[in-house]
Regions:
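Charged docking surfaces used in two-component/phosphorelay signaling
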Residues: 37-45
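Short hydrophobic/Thr-rich beta-strand motif most characteristic of the beta2 strand and flanking loop
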Residues: 47-54, 62
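Conserved acidic carboxylate
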Residues: 30
Length: 144
């Protein structure tokens, strides 16, 4: 089996507004392997540290065991959905301050009630540029 090689260009590191000197950390929860790899590369190239998981349960564990600055989650995943993950984040005293971006292939009108607790909603297919813009906007709002 051929190994996958990903080359990431050198870039400026984005420093966490919460903890100066530490790269901003994005928790990425996405069950689609190809999309997850694409977003990992996009985020790393933009200077973010990425903790990447394939389902909501792993995301919950990662959120509790890492210094996360923002959560990007798919709405529909195995084991624990993005909606349940968002509720978990909002109800956890140590995590409730984190911005959450929900990704979904469903139309926004179909998922509005479930995505209400998310800070932003992006429809799939999501471009790297729109995700980075959304992250930057939410982090700027959080630090002001």
């Amino acid at each position: 089996m051929a190994q996958e090689k990903v080359t990431i260009a050198e870039t400026d590191i984005r420093v966490s507004p919460a903890e100066s000197g530490r790269p901003t950390c994005v928790l990425l929860a996405e069950d689609d392997r190809a999309l997850r790899r694409f977003l990992e590369v996009v985020l790393a190239r933009a200077g973010y540290r990425v903790v990447s998981v394939c389902d909501g349960l792993e995301a919950m564990k990662a959120a509790l065991s890492n210094q996360i600055d923002i959560v990007v989650t798919d709405a529909v995943m195995p084991n624990l959905s993005g909606h349940e993950l968002c509720r978990f984040v909002r109800n956890s005293p140590s995590l409730s301050h984190l911005p959450v971006i929900m990704l979904s292939a469903l139309e926004r009108k179909e998922t509005t009630n479930e995505a209400e607790q998310a800070d932003a909603f992006l429809s799939k297919p999501v471009s790297g540029e729109s995700l980075i813009e959304c992250i930057e906007k939410l982090l700027a709002e959080k630090s002001s």
